[in-house]
Curated annotation (Swiss-Prot):
Organism: Methanocaldococcus jannaschii (strain ATCC 43067 / DSM 2661 / JAL-1 / JCM 10045 / NBRC 100440) (Methanococcus jannaschii)
Cellular localisation: Cell membrane
Lineage: Archaea, Methanobacteriati, Methanobacteriota, Methanomada group, Methanococci
Protein keywords: Cell membrane, Membrane, Transmembrane, Transmembrane helix
Keyword Cell membrane among record annotations: yes
A Pfam family that the UniProt record links to this protein: CbiQ
Key word Methyltransferase present: no
Residue ranges of the TM segments: 32-52, 70-90, 125-145, 237-257
Disulfide bonds: none
Record's protein name: Uncharacterized protein MJ1089
InterPro entries: ABC/ECF_trnsptr_transmembrane (IPR003339), Cobalt_transport_CbiQ (IPR052770), ECF_CbiQ (IPR012809)
A single GO cellular-component term on record: ATP-binding cassette (ABC) transporter complex
Similarity comment: Belongs to the CbiQ family.
Membrane topology: Multi-pass membrane protein
Length: 268
């Protein structure tokens, strides 16, 4: 399999319909919604943020629905599990009981409310980060990091690590395919042996690629800083004001709904 096949996020980031929207504007939008989601005292606002991000990604950016479902599905599953655990194990105010094989298991109101809050925060935060990841290529984010005066060494390390995650993954798949074609995983004993050999060879391959990269960069007059040729203009003030007004609206809504409890409206 090729390198680009593994890097699904970058493929989508370069081909989505919001690709040419100012990346600084997308960073401001995504990070502001992330902060509102994380610090919201109401589960309603983070869920609204989740639906807004989902609509923008699926219908405006045209992110493939299957890809988005995969990336949202995993945290969604953990969120539902977390909600169930909080409903049964945390809380003091009993709402109702469930009879399971003669045992009555209580469900707590305050446990459900806390679980809903964490569930909403998780969905709002994850969708905000996915919006940024699916609409903005990493190279543009690295440039923005530079403009934010992050240390050059840190930005360079992030770029190299991001690149070589996928390079080493491709090496891993080649080695794994070679082992499987030679029946290296035919039983448990050979699987453990093959796994150890794969880890050792992958470490050696990573070391070799690091040495080659260092030689290549030094031969091209590397002076301790990777040059980024791209420049990004500052976004229009009117769009920033629009995002600010929208954020203020969400903050006010979060304040107005902070005492809202779902269980008080459902009678069992």
């Amino acid at each position: 399999m090729g390198f680009m096949k593994h890097n699904i996020v970058d493929n989508v980031a370069f081909s989505n319909k919001l690709r040419h929207v100012n990346p600084k504007l997308k960073v401001i939008f995504a990070l502001s919604l992330l902060l509102i989601s994380v610090f919201s005292t109401s589960f309603i606002v983070p869920l609204i943020i989740f639906f807004i991000n989902s609509i923008l990604l699926l219908f405006k950016a045209k992110v493939p629905k299957k890809i988005y479902a995969v990336f949202v599905g995993i945290p969604l599953g953990f969120g539902i599990l977390n909600l169930v655990i909080f409903a049964f194990l945390f809380g003091t105010v009993e709402w109702f009981k469930i009879n399971v094989f003669g045992f009555e298991i209580p469900v707590y109101k305050d446990g459900i409310e806390l679980g809903l809050l964490l569930f909403g925060r998780m969905l709002g935060g994850v969708s905000s980060m996915l919006f940024l990841a699916f609409t903005t290529p990493m190279v543009e984010l690295f440039y923005i990091f530079r403009e934010l005066k992050m240390p050059d060494v840190l930005v360079d390390m992030m770029m190299l690590i991001y690149r070589y995650i996928f390079v080493l993954y491709e090496e891993y798949e080649k080695m794994k395919f070679a082992q499987e074609s030679r029946l290296g995983t035919s039983n448990l004993k050979s699987t453990y042996k093959s796994l150890g050999a794969l880890a050792a060879h992958l470490f050696i391959r990573a070391w070799e690629k690091g040495e080659k990269l260092n030689i290549t960069m030094m031969s091209r007059c590397y002076d301790g800083k990777i040059k980024l040729l791209q420049t990004i203009e500052n976004p229009s003030i009117k769009y920033i004001l629009f995002i600010a007004i929208f954020d203020i609206f969400l903050i006010i809504l979060a304040y107005l709904t902070k005492d809202f409890t779902l269980t008080s409206y459902i009678k069992i």
